[in-house]
Amino acid sequence: MEIDILSLFPDYFASPLQATILGRAIKQGALSVRSRDIREFGLGKWKQVDDSPYNGEGMLLMAEPVVQAIRSIRRKKSKVIYLSPQGQLLSAKKSRELASCSHLVLLCGHYEGIDERALTAEVDEEISIGDYVLTNGCAAALVLVDALARFIPGVLGNQESAEYDSLENGLLEGPQYTRPRVFEGESVPEVLLCGDHQKIADWRKQVSLERTRERRPDLYLQYFYGNSACLSTQEDLPRIEVVSPKTFSVVLEVQDLRKAKKFYSRMFGKECWDGDKLFLLGKTSLYLQQTKETRGPTTVFIELETDHDFVRFLKRWEMLGGELGEQGTGGFPLRQVFDLDGHIWVVSCVQK
């Protein structure tokens, strides 16, 4: 695999690419990484690459030097990636996908960013390594190279290790142990010494689930959502219990009463209805009111009893034609969803 990195600081990459596993992979020919200076394509006598933006402060990389730099190395099957906090969040899945590319061009951002016209003309995808801003994109480019290199055959001494690392299967990796068998009174778990590979695999899976649930509940719920069995009929699903210590009533304006009632009947159960009034729990109720023009979306907040209810709710909502919105941040099980009329439901799960 070949990777070209475009930045204003090509020497930034020298040490990391000469040492550690990446350096060994490059020496062995499993990976080729080159860094080029965008200033080589600067304008005029002074090789200008930046200028002040029309609508803000600071400086921007100009479109022409960036476009020329990309086109000088781009090939027919190249994929150009811009490292940006606005891009798709880098994941193990995305790293594996990029590792299958024959040639990547990584564009590093500098200053306040890059002229949008250069991105529109040449960039295939934007990728972020996290919800924070760096002084430049060089560190992000190194993170991306390191993450995807692990999936290139020949880079790791033992390719199987990449398959068991944290996040590769959507879960955090469980605890690991080496000699001695007992350290400061704490022993290695007996199951790891039994020699039964199936028991060891089952144990690893269980502790991986427990650790993910404890430390990254967002990943835990995402894992169950993605791996839950395909549901053929809504009648096969048990009722989802809504937690509501307080009494409240909500009126939802809908354009098609029959269609909306069918949607919510399948979501919460036909037995919950009394005319056009839906009882979510106890005295908590939802009224549907048909109108030609709605006054805008209503926001409904509900809390579910268990993680599995949370996952089932999202799966059922999507299957019935509802739209899934943004996932909550900070690892808290929270999701915004939209019904058929655009009303907003903020769904969360009881924290135990």
From Swiss-Prot:
It holds the Pfam family tRNA_m1G_MT. It is found in: Cytoplasm. S-adenosyl-L-methionine binds at G109, I129, G130, D131, Y132, V133, L134. Specifically methylates guanosine-37 in various tRNAs. The keyword Membrane does not apply. It catalyses: guanosine(37) in tRNA + S-adenosyl-L-methionine = N(1)-methylguanosine(37) in tRNA + S-adenosyl-L-homocysteine + H(+). GO terms for cellular component: cytosol. GO terms for biological process: tRNA N1-guanine methylation. Belongs to the RNA methyltransferase TrmD family. It comes from Chlamydia trachomatis serovar A (strain ATCC VR-571B / DSM 19440 / HAR-13). It comes from the Bacteria. The lineage of its organism: Bacteria, Pseudomonadati, Chlamydiota, Chlamydiia, Chlamydiales. Its EC number is 2.1.1.228. Keywords: Cytoplasm, Methyltransferase, S-adenosyl-L-methionine, Transferase, tRNA processing. This is tRNA (guanine-N(1)-)-methyltransferase.
